[in-house]
Amino acid sequence: MASDAPEVKAPKAKTQKKPKTAPTHPPYIQMVTDAILSLKERDGSSLPALKKFIEAKYGKDIHDKKFPKTLSLALKTFVKNGKLVKVKNSYKLSDAQKSKAKAAAKPKAAPKKAAAPKKAAAPKKAKAPKKEGEKKAVKPKSEKKAAKPKTEKKPKAAKKPKAAKKPAAKKPAAKKPAAKKATPKKAAAPKKAAAPKKAKAATPKKAKAATPKKAKAAAKPKAAAKPKAAAKPKAKAAKKA
């Protein structure tokens, strides 16, 4: 009878599930809106285009092996919630989602502008008194420089104008051009006196040349005496006899 009793199975120990690690990437709606606004396609962005953009920008933070399936499921839920609008095989942002995205982008730029005036804080004014202290330390140096002109014997330099009397040496320079003008005049005078000397030398030469011509004229009568011409008629007379 005891064998017919059903055996009671011992309950299995429940295995503790590993705690899910919080994702380091932003939520899917934020990644999808960023992808659609960055791609700027008129007819909307397709699933492959959105997947490529998200993997390129947030791939390091996504550790889901089934990321393509989870992305497609997320897009379908966003269309049902009215956050996205599906046009054929592409997805666009709804008007409500566009306004949210623009409103989220404006406050990010505003704190940066507010941080700029904070940098221009009063510490720069604290540096100003330090510069004043440095200027005070420099002032005694300038006073010492003001005392130096008393000891400097610069008035002696005023005696140097004695050397300025050297311009009187210009007088010998003026004598030199005067001497140059006198020398050419003296050289021109002897040249004119040399001309009559040449005329005196020409007169004796003409007298000497005239005397030999007269001697030649006296010799000519000696050649004129030819008595031999008279003897020829005697020979002719002998032939006649």
From Swiss-Prot:
Annotated InterPro entries: H1/H5 (IPR005819), Histone_H1/H5_H15 (IPR005818), WH-like_DNA-bd_sf (IPR036388), WH_DNA-bd_sf (IPR036390)
Region of interest (8 X 6 AA repeats of P-K-K-A-[AK]-A), residue spans: 111-217
Listed GO MF terms: double-stranded DNA binding; nucleosomal DNA binding; structural constituent of chromatin
SMART domains in the record: H15 (SM00526)
GO cellular component: nucleosome; nucleus
Sequence repeats by residue range: 111-116, 117-122, 123-128, 184-189, 190-195, 196-201, 204-209, 212-217
Keywords for this protein: Chromosome, DNA-binding, Nucleus, Repeat
Top-rank lineage group of the source organism: Eukaryota
Protein name, as recorded: Histone H1-II
Taxonomic lineage from the root: Eukaryota, Viridiplantae, Chlorophyta, core chlorophytes, Chlorophyceae
Annotated stretches, region: Disordered: 1-27, 89-241
Function recorded in the entry: Histones H1 are necessary for the condensation of nucleosome chains into higher-order structures.
DNA-binding region: 183-186, 203-206, 211-214
Biased composition (Basic residues): 11-20, 99-111, 156-184, 194-241
Domain H15 residues, every copy: 24-95
Natural source organism: Volvox carteri (Green alga)
CDD domains according to UniProt: H15 (cd00073)
Compartments reported by the entry: Nucleus; Chromosome
Stretches with biased composition (Basic and acidic residues): 1-10, 129-155
Pfam family, any one: Linker_histone
One BP term from GO: chromosome condensation
Family: Belongs to the histone H1/H5 family.
